[in-house]
Amino acid sequence: MKKYTILGGLMAATATLVFSQPSAAPVKKGTVEKITVHGKSLEGNLEGDSPDRDVFVYLPPSYATAKNRRYPVVYLLHGYGLSGERWVPFINLLDASDKTVAEGTAKEMILVSPDAFTIYSGSMYSSSPTTGDWETFIAEDLVSYVDSHYRTVANRMSRGLAGHSMGGYGTVRIGMKRPDVFSSMYIMSACCLMNNPGAGRGGQAAAKQPPPDSAKANGKNNGKGGRFGNVQAADAAAWSPNPSNPPQFFDLPVKEGELQPSIAAKWVANSPLAMVDQYVTNLKKYHAIAGDCGLQDGLVGSNKDLDASFTRLGIAHTFETYEGDHTNHVKERFEGSVLPFFSNNLTFMSGKK
């Protein structure tokens, strides 16, 4: 009995110690706002997509109370077939951002994600009379709006650009042209790095696609994402637009089974691997460039080619491969790699990176 009594007392004491431990402090919460930003650069696009774009803005936990504090901004570009509304949970934007702040793996930043879903399920973040000038919308219209409506550190050293898949393509495409706006970029599993219509990602499938009917052109596509059937049409609208070819206003690189060399050349010219040599000086102005891609991702080869091109051209950067496919580790990469990367490389109010 004595032995039992001592054990019982020990258990009681242990229980008291366990239950008397202070509870972990709750994670401070940021917020995500859905706003509308008018894109002057998107006005008059021949697809008929609205120039008024949904934009999702993450404001960190201290934003509501630290009224004199300003924050760096990271612009996040979603992939093809997604809307901005679907992209936010796809990367776990709110919880991942709050968690990294709470754990100290990233400092507080404003995160901005525009909706680039179009009638063909994606803008390709390109400049075209058919789609509108998405390059200028991102780098000028959107940045100007955010700087004028939020407490940002409004200079290039405090702006980052990142994206996944089509958004990775947009990050490279816009980033290499606009070092005056951004100082750091993170390229996640970029698509479309070499566009060769004669080898796989071509126009034959698009040639079988009817142009959008008037209902779609008038905006009745609900914008929820997930429509991958129009990918070649989206490419053509972005890279081989033709205002003289209604109703779709683009040319396809394959016609009746035959490659159209002049059109195919336009697609190649819109490939970052073909463009990069033109923008070496711009890319060397970046404070930091990083990229990643899953080893089981069908795009890993072209992403490795971009890494090799940067190395050949003396462009400082890092590139990492990991076990995974195109989508199954995006949330983990966003939380564990993307947010810490920008936290370490952007300039905050103190002037420290």
Q: Language model features by range: what are they?
A:
Residues 21-353:
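Non-catalytic cap/lid and distal C-terminal segments of serine-dependent acyl enzymes
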Residues 8-16:
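Bacterial N-terminal signal peptides
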